[in-house]
Amino acid sequence: GKRPGAGCAYLEPWHLDYEDFLNLRRNTGDERLRCHDINTASWIPDIFMRKVQAEEEWYLFNPNECPELHDLHGEAFDKKYNYYCKKAEKGEVKNFRKLPAKDLWKKVLKVLFETSHPWNTFKDPCNIRYTNQHEGAVHSSNLCTEITLHTKASQYKEGEKVKTGETAVCNLGSVNVRNHLR
């Protein structure tokens, strides 16, 4: 038998577009804002869950204003995230949104219940256990989430690609050993 290919888009809950991302698989609303043929997953840092539990505020940022967050995890991420929260409060970050972390978590769970997407994957545990840490932070996994996948973005300078990135794939296959025995 053949199984069709599948892809998955991951986004972290600090991203300014995260709430729109949550709704990509919904069956209601503006169809131009929906994406029914791709899987979605949240790449959740531990600090988000701590803020949910403590009923604290959560900030969503434009990644252009805080580009380091994407490649950080654990304490380094927490420190830089809190740094940008303070900058936002001082008016030094232009594009951000603040809301109760618990409210955002409720939205995540509501949409997950309605659509089975995005599934929740936890960034810090995945990176702590990542066997190729010398390659940098891992940003995604295979569809079953038991294998973390390393990716690197292409690099551009003045609109020209100067370095090609790396795309991760997970090829699944099966072999019926009996067919190969004599």
Segments predicted by a language model, with ranges:
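Active-site cavity-forming subdomains of large catalytic enzyme subunits
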Residues: 1-174, 181
